């Protein structure tokens, strides 16, 4: 049920799985926001999980060095004792290794869930169940992985009140482009076509085509209305 940064898996697969859960009658979602996830990864816990699969001490030392790489702030390097370097090539892989514990726990509890990197949604059949699951999973993450759930950004609500990977999922199991995703794309189009940029017409068209192709390719899985209709006006 994990789709982020894994071979032959993608956001479209995560959306398809989520839609299947909703169609089965689980129209309430536990939408968890892990507070500053990449900044708060506990190095010792992560290294203990990695050591379960890797015995090469030199490689383990190299990974630890990667985690401890200092951060440059105001010209000074500060030591890092937790978190992973955002944008680093290993960070997505390491996040999956750490959150595999969460996957196993949710499987053990027989929950219907979809995870994409640190974005995890759990689907249940009632509001009461959603509230109970949010509290219990937050407790698990805090006690076992030293990760904090941001309760002000997390929610136990109807699926159509939240967005997941840029989509809004509806209670009938269909998906549409979320309002925020549409708004961001329109803003990008306005920026590209802004006259004050002083770019040649051909360059503007080339940049606009590139942005449009990428957006439509990602949101081609939307059920209705079509992504093109979203952009009318």
Role assignments for model-derived ranges:
Residues 1-161:
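Conserved polymerase palm-domain catalytic core
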Residues 13, 17, 45, 58, ...:
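Exposed alpha-helical structural elements
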Residues 124, 193, 197, 216-223:
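Short amphipathic alpha-helical interaction patches enriched in hydrophobic/aromatic residues
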Residues 6, 85, 125, 200-203, ...:
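A structural signal for alpha-helical segments
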Residues 204-233:
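Non-catalytic, peripheral interaction segments enriched in hydrophobic/basic residues
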Residues 68, 142-207, 211-213:
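A conserved non-catalytic segment of reverse transcriptases
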């Amino acid at each position: 049920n994990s789709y982020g940064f894994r071979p032959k898996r993608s956001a479209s697969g995560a959306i398809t799985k989520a839609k299947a859960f909703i169609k089965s009658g689980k129209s309430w979602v536990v939408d968890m926001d892990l507070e500053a996830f990449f900044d708060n990864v506990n190095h010792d816990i992560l290294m203990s999980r990695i050591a379960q699969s890797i015995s090469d001490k030199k490689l383990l030392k190299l990974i630890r060095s990667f985690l401890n790489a200092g951060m440059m702030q105001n010209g000074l390097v500060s030591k890092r004792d937790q978190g992973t370097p955002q944008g680093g090539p290993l960070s997505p892989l390491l996040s999956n290794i750490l959150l595999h514990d969460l996957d196993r726990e949710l499987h053990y509890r027989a929950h219907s869930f979809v995870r994409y990197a640190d974005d995890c949604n759990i689907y249940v059949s009632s509001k009461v169940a959603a509230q109970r699951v949010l509290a219990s999973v937050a407790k698990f993450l805090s006690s076992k992985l030293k990760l904090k759930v941001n309760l002000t950004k997390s929610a136990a609500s109807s699926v159509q009140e939240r967005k997941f990977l840029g989509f809004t999922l509806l209670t009938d199991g269909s998906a549409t482009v979320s309002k925020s995703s549409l708004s961001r794309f329109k803003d990008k189009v306005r920026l590209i076509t802004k006259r004050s940029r002083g770019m040649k017409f051909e360059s503007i068209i080339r940049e606009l085509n590139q942005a449009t192709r990428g957006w439509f390719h990602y949101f081609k899985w939307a059920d209705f209305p079509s992504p093109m209709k979203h952009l009318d006006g």
